[in-house]
């Protein structure tokens, strides 16, 4: 990460790091351990990431440790395609503990209208407008 951060700095490119728990060495329970993500986010920031993209899990009170522990902004990833109401709750919970935003893929690309979904994400993330989000993200 540090070498890549140095290269990104040369070209004035931001480095977004996504710490992962892929692989078979961790139990399913450990892969959902908020304290592990808090440590991974901190390490990514210390190694030169400009932003960290993490899975959201637990409660806002638990996830606060990820945001507080990380020296750079934290955004949440979208994960698997989900129902709009669940996505809205996840975003609202994450924003309540200080994440800087969302970095979504499948919930945009797999929607019926990706452009409308992006507008809905903007409405919810920037303005707290859940109704517009739910209307646009059917």
Question: What do the PLM-derived regions correspond to, one by one?
Answer:
Residues 79:
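Cofactor-binding loop segments of dinucleotide-utilizing enzymes, especially the Rossmann-like FAD-
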Residues 117, 135-138:
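Flexible C-terminal active-site loop/helix
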């Amino acid at each position: 990460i540090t070498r890549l951060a140095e290269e990104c700095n040369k070209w004035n490119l931001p480095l977004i790091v996504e710490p992962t728990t892929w692989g078979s060495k961790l139990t399913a329970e450990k892969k959902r351990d908020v304290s592990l993500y808090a440590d991974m986010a901190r390490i990514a920031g210390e190694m030169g990431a400009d932003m960290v993209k993490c899975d959201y899990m637990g409660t806002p009170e638990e996830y606060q440790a990820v945001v507080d522990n990380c020296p750079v902004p934290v955004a949440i990833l979208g994960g698997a395609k989900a129902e709009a109401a669940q996505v809205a709750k996840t975003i609202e919970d994450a924003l309540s503990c200080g994440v800087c935003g969302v970095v979504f893929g499948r919930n945009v690309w797999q929607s019926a209208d990706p452009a409308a979904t992006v507008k809905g994400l903007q409405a919810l993330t920037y303005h707290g407008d859940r109704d517009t989000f739910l209307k646009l993200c059917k």
